[in-house]
C-alpha cells in the first residue's frame, strides 16, 4: 500500500514539516522540547523516528490531543507551568499562550514592584548575575587619537 507523504502537518496550532521524524517535528512547537516530544510518542505508542507526514490521520489527531492536553498525559513535574498563580492548577502551555503567560508574569512583577519587577523595568539583570563589567547599556564613547601637529 503506497501512502502519500504530507508536506505540512498541523499539530497544536503549528505547521510542522511532514518530512521530519515525529519527535523532531514536535519539538518545533514552542513549549514542546525534545524530551517532551519523546515522552508523548512513548505514551501514545508512536515510533518517534517515523516520518510525521506518513502517519495516518488518527495518529496525528492523537498527537494533537496529547500536545494540547499534556497535563493529562505527563506527571506534574514534567509540565512548564506548575501551580499557576491565577488558577492554582498544573498546566503545560504551548505556542502563543506560553509567550503571553511569561509576559503577564513579568508585568505582574513590575506592577507589584517586587525586586525582580524593578530589575525588569530598569532593564537590568534579574537573576543575581554580576553587573560590574557586563550588561552595560548605551553607546560606547571609544578612544580617539590626537591629531598630529604638522612640522614637529
UniProtKB/Swiss-Prot annotation:
Keywords: Ribonucleoprotein, Ribosomal protein, RNA-binding, rRNA-binding. GO terms for molecular function: rRNA binding; structural constituent of ribosome. GO terms for cellular component: cytosol; small ribosomal subunit. PROSITE patterns: RIBOSOMAL_S13_1, RIBOSOMAL_S13_2. The keyword Ribosomal protein applies. The keyword RNA-binding applies. GO terms for biological process: translation. SUPFAM superfamilies: S13-like H2TH domain. Part of the 30S ribosomal subunit. Forms a loose heterodimer with protein S19. Forms two bridges to the 50S subunit in the 70S ribosome. Located at the top of the head of the 30S subunit, it contacts several helices of the 16S rRNA. In the 70S ribosome it contacts the 23S rRNA (bridge B1a) and protein L5 of the 50S subunit (bridge B1b), connecting the 2 subunits; these bridges are implicated in subunit movement. PANTHER family: 30S RIBOSOMAL PROTEIN S13/40S RIBOSOMAL PROTEIN S18, SMALL RIBOSOMAL SUBUNIT PROTEIN US13. Belongs to the universal ribosomal protein uS13 family. This is Small ribosomal subunit protein uS13. It comes from Pyrobaculum arsenaticum (strain DSM 13514 / JCM 11321 / PZ6).
